[in-house]
């Protein structure tokens, strides 16, 4: 055996044995896999697609839902080509209309004339996802402006049965259950006291691998805005004690930046729409976000330790509109061009500094922590070794799953990353240098 390898292995073993155990929260394997997805697609689809409303009234006739050419495989193929790893569908929005034949509701596709009452959007989408290797997720709003039980103790049991009909296996594995915290009045003018422990327990019983979204998790949290940006500082940890989803939760700042001393691992999910609204409208076909705007969102979400959930709403045909799909392909092409060539060479660690060779010009730095050991880095500096010596390029804060630092255009033979503040011994799992000639 090579002596150098033996010595290096012995040194690593000694370091591992002497390193103080990390005392902060750690992610579950499911949370690590979730954040590795980096980009998923949101599909807002339902009666609002046909009315132009964002929040339906719950009194819409079931026949209003009538997509003329539903093609969930087109959604999935589009998502896959754009680099998305999963799709979340609004199976039931606040209006109560169910995109599947929910046995405890009379406001579903079963009561519509679409496909003679035999249609099931969730079946079509889950099967398409399975065929293409894309993960399937669901948004099921507990608010129901149609169900007569809403606002009574019985409704919580009705909602559990709703969850069971989706999560019980008929549609296969569900990677994320999205709970909107909205809680308005039902048809009887009453509000509901949601039994969140019961709802969460139902999800975990039926889909134990699923990530549960809400403003306080427990799987992932809302980023605190719908504009598409996580905080420049963004911890994957959050203080959730004493909070209830949708009711006086953490401050917008805590949601956006996390809590350095957070007691639970609840990483941020950045949800934003490719259009001004969440549901499709013909009047917004000329307002789809530009590639420049989408790149900004990418850098400020994925590049700031968050997963990006980009809403791309199907139209009244039941298809992703050509304007949206074309823009997504342009966005994908831009990302592929930017990150095609990593000019970072060998890296050498000395204490809390890493020096990496630079094999060409660059203006983007990608850093990743080994988050299985926890999020540790609180601040770091970036320097480049040029003909004039070492020059500071950036001073930044957290890293987490991924941090993309936008640097000035630089030509250097080496880059040094120095962690200046951390909760414990820092561990970087990846260092990359790239040239972006697209984003301005």
List each model region and its residues.
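Conserved catalytic region of serine esterases and O-acyltransferases that act on ester linkages
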Residues: 440
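Sec-dependent signal peptide recognition
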Residues: 2-8
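Hydrophobic h-region of N-terminal signal peptides that target proteins for export
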Residues: 10-17
């Amino acid at each position: 055996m090579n002596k150098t390898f033996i010595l290096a292995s012995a040194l690593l073993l000694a370091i591992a044995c002497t390193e103080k155990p990390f005392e902060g929260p750690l992610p579950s394997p499911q949370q690590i896999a979730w954040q590795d997805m980096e980009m998923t697609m949101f599909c807002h689809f339902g009666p609002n697609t046909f009315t132009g409303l964002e929040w339906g009234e719950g009194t819409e006739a079931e026949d209003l839902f009538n997509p003329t050419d539903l093609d969930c495989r087109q959604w999935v193929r589009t998502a896959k080509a754009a680099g998305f790893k999963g799709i979340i569908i609004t199976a039931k929005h606040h209006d109560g209309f169910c995109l599947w034949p929910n046995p405890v509701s009379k406001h579903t596709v079963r009561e519509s004339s679409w496909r003679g009452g035999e249609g099931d959007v969730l079946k079509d989408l889950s099967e398409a996802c399975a065929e293409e290797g894309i993960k399937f997720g669901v948004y099921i709003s507990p608010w129901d402006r149609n169900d007569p039980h809403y606002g009574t103790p019985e409704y919580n049991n009705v909602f559990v049965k709703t969850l069971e009909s989706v999560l019980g296996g008929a549609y296969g594995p569900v990677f994320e259950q999205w709970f909107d915290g909205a809680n308005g009045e039902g048809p009887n003018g009453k509000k509901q006291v949601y039994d969140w422990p019961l709802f969460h327990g139902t999800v975990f019983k039926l889909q134990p691998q699923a990530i549960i979204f809400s403003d306080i998790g427990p799987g992932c949290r809302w980023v605190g805005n719908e504009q598409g940006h996580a905080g420049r500082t963004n911890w994957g940890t959050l203080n959730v004690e004493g909070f209830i989803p949708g009711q006086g939760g953490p401050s917008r700042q805590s949601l956006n930046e996390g809590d350095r001393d957070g007691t639970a691992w609840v990483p941020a999910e950045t949800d934003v729409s490719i259009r001004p609204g969440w549901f499709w409208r013909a009047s917004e076909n000329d307002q789809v976000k530009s590639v420049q705007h989408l790149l900004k969102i990418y850098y400020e979400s994925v590049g700031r330790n968050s997963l990006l959930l980009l809403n791309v709403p199907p139209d009244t045909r039941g298809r992703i509109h050509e304007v949206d799909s074309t823009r997504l392909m342009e966005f994908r092409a831009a990302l592929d061009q930017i990150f095609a060539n990593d000019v970072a060479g060998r890296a050498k660690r000395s204490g809390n500094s890493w020096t990496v060779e630079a094999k060409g010009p660059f203006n983007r730095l990608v850093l990743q922590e080994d988050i299985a050991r926890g999020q540790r880095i609180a601040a770091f500096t970036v320097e480049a070794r040029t003909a004039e010596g070492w020059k500071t390029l950036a001073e930044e804060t957290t890293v987490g799953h991924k941090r993309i630092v936008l640097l000035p255009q630089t030509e250097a033979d080496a880059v040094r990353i120095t962690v200046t503040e951390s909760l414990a011994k820092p561990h970087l799992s990846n260092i990359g240098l790239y040239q972006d000639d697209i984003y301005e």
